Amino acid sequence: MERIRKKPIAVSRGAIVFAFNSSKYNYAQMAVYTARRIEAFLGIPTTLVTDIESFKTIINDKDVFDSIIEVEPDTSNMREQHAWINKGRYQAYELSPYEETLVLDVDYLVNSDCLLKTFDLSDSFCCHKNTHMLMHPEAAQEKMSAYSYDTLWATVIMFKKSNRAKQIFETLEMV
């Protein structure tokens, strides 16, 4: 059952993206591209959360962002022998300047205005439960372990400032 808001509410809406460059990828440059697509397809502002070293690589493109928040990156997460700085997304609730926020991976391509519909849902927190692999359409959905819950995906999150959303982000910080 779809839960839709009965009346539209005038609130601040925007997107927040996290970008910390690695030795392999320039995530800040990806964030610039993503912010341009967010503006073109969704018509909402984008806030960038990054570190000073990553920001230096896009200083000429800084105007694409509504605001830029500099944070100290958590480099303790390793993936394939490289630092994978992706642990700070639990801060999205506190860092977002918007009442209603889309949290997007910088490598997620916005190609339509469909994500705007998430703001019309009455839920205060939404994320994807399922993935669809184009090259492997029959692939099983991932679980955190064999005896665990289904994996929920943080590629796209919509949240509204509320007690429920705040509690979810506080829980994410503990994981």
Kindly give the residue locations of the regions a language model identified.
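Glycosyltransferase catalytic domains, chiefly GT-A lineage
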Residues: 1-175
